[in-house]
Design a protein with these regions (language model features):
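Pore domain of cation channels
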Residues: 57-113
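Pore-domain transmembrane helices of cation channels
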Residues: 1-27
Length: 113
């Protein structure tokens, strides 16, 4: 129970942090204040118009997905971190996930008769 709570909290908290980090947050992104992204989503890499709209912008769900895949794979999957702060934040998230997993497994082994 406790490990699952930490796991879900890790995903949500880091999803919010990724959303707030990228280009200064959602309001700064909308205003176009910072043209340099912290994350490179596949839709931003010149994919054909049949795959992504030309005006596509990441939403909170996209950052939550990045958080989920980072925890599950312990690495970036389709969305690459570009800035040092994005890389550090993803590293911290994966470290928290691995540490939680190790502690839960150690506790489970410890309670065996």
């Amino acid at each position: 129970g406790g490990g699952a709570g930490i796991f879900v909290t890790n995903i949500i908290v880091f999803g919010v942090w990724f959303w707030e980090l990228d280009r200064g947050g959602p309001f700064a992104r909308k205003a176009g204040e910072n043209p340099y992204p912290d994350f490179m989503f596949p839709q931003m890499s010149g994919v054909p118009a049949q795959v992504a709209r030309p005006d596509w912008r990441p939403t909170f769900v996209d950052y939550l997905y990045v958080s989920i895949t980072n925890v599950m794979a312990f690495s970036p999957t389709d969305t690459m971190p570009l800035s040092a702060r994005a890389k550090l934040l993803m590293t911290v998230q994966a470290t928290v996930a691995v540490s939680t997993l190790v502690l839960v497994v150690a506790r489970a082994v410890n309670v065996l008769p």
